[in-house]
Amino acid sequence: MGLAGFARPLQWFKSQWLWLLLSIAAFWLLMRVQVEWLWFGQFDWQGMLLRRWLWQLGGLLLALLVVATCQLWQRNWIKLEGASNLAEPALPLHGWRYGLGLLGCFVVVVGDLVLLTRLAWLACFKPFALGHWWSEPFEDIWALVIPLSCVFISICVMLGNARGGRIAHLMGCFCFSISIARGWGLWSLALAIPPTGIKEPLLGADVSFGLGQFPALAFALVVLLAQLVLTTSTTIWMKLAQPESLSDWVFKGLSPRQCDVMRPLIGIILLTLSALLWLSRHELLWTQNGTVAGAGWLDAHLILPLRSLASLAILVLAFLVIPFPWIQQRRLWRLIASIIGVGAILLEVLLAPFVQWMVVKPRELKLETPYIIRAIKATRKAFQLDSITTTLINPQPQLTQLDLEQGASTLRNIRLWDSQPLLATNRQLQQLRVYYRFSNAAVDRYRFVPDKANRQQVMITARELDQAALPKRSRTWLNRHFVFTHGYGFTLSPVNTRAPDGLPDYFISDLGTSTRLEGSSELGITREDVKEAVPIGRAALYFGMLPSPYALAPSKLKELDYPVGDKNIYNHYLGSGGVPVGHPWQQLAAAMYLFEPRLLNTGSLTINSKLLIRREVRQRVSAIAPFLEVIGDPYLVSTSVNSRDHDYQAKQNQYWIVEAYTSSRTYPYAANLPDGRPVRYLRNSVKAIVDAYSGRVHLYVSEPRDPIILGWQRLFPDLFKPLEEMPSSLREHLKVPTDLFNVQVQQLLRYHVTDPRIFYSGDDVWQVPKELYGKRQVPVDPYHITAQLGSQESSEFLLLQPLTPLARPNLSAWLAARSDGDHYGKLVLLRFPSQTPIFGPEQIQALINQDPQISQQFGLWDRAGSEVVQGNLLVVPLGKALLYVEPVYLRARQGGLPTLTRVVVSDGKRIAMAEDLGEGLRALVDGSSKKAVYLNRNDLPPIKAADQSN
């Protein structure tokens, strides 16, 4: 039969396997699509998912059109007849010139493949980072780039001629298509983002161009340029690497016909490069190379004109390359345009450092002043520092009884419990089983007594299920996914009281039928007040902040609800959330989605069973709105929601509040964060509410003037609701996120200065002060207080950050973020007079530790085998004075329970230490308490901390 007889069956066999593999891939994709469709269906958001798919499909079709055009051009060019003896060849190569051309072409192909592979990698795993791909970390891509480069080298070596280049081109086309399709978020936002009406002063573009259009255009031009260059270089490679050329080390050259067909593609490449250079002028607006952020004098007067000139020269060159018949003396003009374009680029590289050193540096302040003003204004705008209300206060040097009376509402909520000691106590007393875990303690406030103007500040900790803590013998597949499915309940503690033994008081503790609700006679709160203000209801936590595997519920197996003594109480999931898996085809889809074949043979599923996935609430919000950044820890709220709101279940009381942000790296003239993170614009634009039982998600827009979120609202109008539609019982628990506040504090350290001369000299830079916590010196974190702001009669919930001058410990200012009612999100800067030194946290702690009686008591406790932990030092405005409060905890050196042992108070002039805050204040004001240690500062040696620098 011969070899030819076997060729046809072999070809048939290969095609059958190919179709089988394609069918399996299509079926697997269909199953994944079904699960995703049903998952979004639980929120009635299939329309949003469909729009996302359509955007990706549109991008894919556009990419395939470009790819098909490139493939068609390449195939037609390859078919053209090469150089002959009758025609004068172009670019003939031989000897070392041929080797150099071969090497150069190879380097271009590999470089293009590396770039396209990197973009495809980001598109698959970080699609919303494509707009700033050049600044993304590169280390995790090497695992893909190096093998691909080796594969290409092997292909070229083994296959030799055209096939190696063709496969490389197909690889690049595949990466190009993935990048375009998965970059849907860039294109859609660029089309939908509204103008802000704010023009940047250098190029006159609206700020929204930098926030939305620039990232999309930059990515589109880069990926298109890479694809076109790859098409050209692989095509040339296929000609250079012909067997006869490799054997003779000679390339005969290109025929005139081949050159004519090549010129339009070269012209398009040059047009794309020209557009990219023109767009790069906007990149000057967010550089960090000069004195301040954004374009400086050198950028505006040298680099900007040079880039414009280079772009125009390459544009002219592109038209000269394309064979238009009416253009005469083509070679001369091409040479002139090339010299101008390359010369402008070289001048930018070579001349800019010289001009900076010779012209700008000697007159830097004068030349850069207009640009410093722009940078200050833009940075303050980008981080909402321009809306800060500044108040000057001059506190009295000594606390009086009148201050205590005026600040009575503040004193009722002075926080004495830090989150770390409270968590340590909860983990030993309230976790109750090894598989429960308290992840964090969130500060919040509840209105226990309706007729009181002020709400009680509390700490709430959710008791979540930590499957990693299950004993090994209990980590079976059925236990992990059918039985141990949820956490249960929470603890609620007042921040300002303690039990007689020094442990925390609890409004709510324990769990299940053993749940204890207690009032506080000290605070005037009854058990009924707690029961009314903090309903518990159905306290199972199926969704939380800990990573959790998928769960299948309800099923034939009962789920562990909570333990009671030595017994366990079991229950079934009754929520509406989840993906139905009651029917065989749904189970097949879930098994393929999870790569879990055991689902098909478990026998434990019922017709009502549901698959619960994405149970970590931050991951859940990110899956629904991947264009939002979910930063920081969510916090739990337990409250009643009006049953008239059909989006909420009447029996459900526990909800997670998740903070979601929009950000940008391309806000004109705005500065990076001082810690180096390339964030130049940040808004806490969305508050997400997640039902802890059913997983239902609600997204509310908290920054309606943010152009980025306005763009997403245009694209997905059904996804977001205005903040006013959030139930009032949940809105009462909103607070300014600590992560956003920290970013604003970092920028304020330098950008509180608006005078360009002072800003340039750096004479008025602030810093976050430090304090001694335990045995370590740490920066003072922002802390929540319920206090009166200025001359207000009632207190409000504030997030406060004290600030000191750089390298000096005296207090310069407070930044306070308001969270209550109509004042939500407003920033207030309380500035202290510079001529009157106000003690900062370091100095007060130095006073405390130099007090002979206090230090003696600390030493006695240490020698007795206990460890003294000095807690967070709070600086609180009280009347017309300042009050410094530091809790002191005592714990055994080996895993003991932290107990609140003492409270140290000071007004900067006097110090008192007592068993509770009331005794300490009485001692501080009039020295009347016999239970307190009291000392006047005049009796102390000079403060050592005053001479320390940070």
Swiss-Prot record:
It comes from the Bacteria. The chain crosses the membrane at residues 20-40, 53-73, 102-122, 141-161, 173-193, 209-229, 259-279, 308-328, 335-355. Keywords: Cell membrane, Membrane, Transmembrane, Transmembrane helix. Disulfide bonds: none annotated. Pfam families: UPF0182 (PF03699). InterPro entries: UPF0182. It is a multi-pass membrane protein. GO terms for cellular component: extracellular region; plasma membrane. Its main location: membrane. It is found in: Cell membrane. Belongs to the UPF0182 family. PANTHER family: UPF0182 PROTEIN SLL1060. This is UPF0182 protein P9303_14611.
